[in-house]
Amino acid sequence: MARRPRSSRAWHFVLSAARRDADARAVALAGTANWGYDSDGQHSDSDSDPECASLPSSIPSAVPVTGESFCDCDSQSEAFCGSLHTAHRGRDCRCGEEDEYFDWVWDDLNKSSATLLSCDNRKVSFHMEYSCGTAAIRGTKELGEGQHFWEIKMTSPVYGTDMMVGIGTSDVDLDKYHHTFCSLLGRDEDSWGLSYTGLLHHKGDKTSFSSRFGQGSIIGVHLDTWHGTLTFFKNRKCIGVAATQLQNKRFYPMVCSTAAKSSMKVIRSCASVTSLQYLCCFRLRQLRPGSGDTLEGLPLPPGLKQVLHHKLGWVLSMSRQPPAPSPAANGPEPRRCQRKRCRRT
């Protein structure tokens, strides 16, 4: 029988839910009777089948998301090289990584066993060889009163059962699903998670929230404990308010992944009190949404401009207008902009 091409086999296995791997590792381990393979680059046995396996995925999980990068670097536009689970290892893209001070980094003491930290604990890598479940990690700082903003950059191909960015309380068990492929963030009332498929998860429910994101995408998160809102950004443009009524609650920034050899990096983490200065900068950005430099042309002392850029640069640079919906054939349709406008009352 003629051998089917690799790309054809991958699509066939995804659509038929066959549990096989397209990597060469499958050949080396094919003699092991009790193991199977799936599209996350995972070894899978009877206790590591994905929950909700009967539910259709919004995009084929074996195929990495492309075309959603913040920049046009070659290393971001080239997804996989050689096989579904061998990432293109070109020069690391540093676009969007201007910050030098970070309010928090990833916590080496509160993470799943299948994680590895690097870059001064700002970059987390998941499932270094293969995956047998879901790995997660949280930040070093519990976020309480004030304004909190951070950005996570997808530094590897994005694929698999799920890769998520979100928040959760101290009650979230990060290692609970280390033998289960699932969307960990948002499975209960203690966490919210935005999936790379564009689905928002909370209390076990899924809501179509945005277009998908992939390698090179920058996902921003704004936790406003004054107004009690959680807002997500994609490539520094607002995509919507995900949660409200979060006043007087404390959360940790969290990410999770089921994909083998996947990674994410904190490129910005900052905090501010909800002061008159913050509210003024926020209002200025609303009044000048299309300006590259919100303070440009304003009659302010140079020293004050420098202080504001240093302390509240993220407020002055973010686009608060949600993007217009685009007819994406392979992704969930975003909700109407009118229902997701980032405004304060």
Swiss-Prot record:
GO MF assignments: ubiquitin-like ligase-substrate adaptor activity
Origin: domain of life: Eukaryota
GO CC annotation, single: nucleus
Main location: nucleus
Record key words, sorted: Nucleus, Ubl conjugation pathway
Renumbered residue ranges of the record's region Disordered: 38-58, 320-345
Database matches in Pfam families: SPRY (PF00622)
Residue span, SOCS box domain: 263-314
Domain named B30.2/SPRY: residues: 84-273
InterPro entries reported for this sequence: B30.2/SPRY, B30.2/SPRY_sf, ConA-like_dom_sf, FBXO45-Fsn/SPSB_families, SOCS_box, SPRY_dom, SPRY_SPSB3
Task performed by this protein: Substrate-recognition component of a cullin-5-RING E3 ubiquitin-protein ligase complex (ECS complex, also named CRL5 complex), which mediates the ubiquitination and subsequent proteasomal degradation of target proteins, such as CGAS and SNAI1. The ECS(SPSB3) complex catalyzes 'Lys-48'-linked ubiquitination of nuclear CGAS in cycling cells, leading to its degradation. Recognizes and binds nucleosome-bound CGAS: ubiquitination and degradation of nuclear CGAS during G1 and G2 phases is required to promote low intranuclear CGAS abundance before the next mitotic cycle.
Assembly with partners or alone: Substrate-recognition component of the ECS(SPSB3) complex, composed of SPSB3, CUL5, ELOB, ELOC and RNF7/RBX2. Interacts with MET.
Assigned protein family: Belongs to the SPSB family.
Protein name: SPRY domain-containing SOCS box protein 3
Organism: Bos taurus
